[in-house]
UniProtKB/Swiss-Prot annotation:
InterPro entries: Cytochr_b6-f_cplx_su8_sf (IPR036143), Cytochrome_b6-f_cplx_su8 (IPR005497). The gene is petN. Belongs to the PetN family. Component of the cytochrome b6-f complex, which mediates electron transfer between photosystem II (PSII) and photosystem I (PSI), cyclic electron flow around PSI, and state transitions. SUPFAM superfamilies: PetN subunit of the cytochrome b6f complex. It is a single-pass membrane protein. GO terms for molecular function: electron transporter, transferring electrons within cytochrome b6/f complex of photosystem II activity. It comes from Prochlorococcus marinus (strain SARG / CCMP1375 / SS120). This is Cytochrome b6-f complex subunit 8. Pfam families: PetN (PF03742). One of its GO terms (cellular component) is plasma membrane-derived thylakoid membrane. GO terms for biological process: cytochrome complex assembly; photosynthesis. Keywords: Electron transport, Membrane, Photosynthesis, Thylakoid, Transmembrane, Transmembrane helix, Transport. NCBIfam families: PRK02529.1 (NF002709). It is found in: Cellular thylakoid membrane.
Length: 33
């Protein structure tokens, strides 16, 4: 169960970082960390 949870969180972090890169390249400026 812990192994599955680890993979799920890893996938979530990966997806989040990809989304951040995509949003950052939009040049929108609304999302600024």
């Amino acid at each position: 169960m812990l192994f599955t949870f680890a993979w799920a969180s890893l996938a979530a972090i990966f997806t989040f970082s990809i989304a951040m890169v995509v949003w950052g390249r939009n040049g929108d400026g609304t999302i600024d960390l």
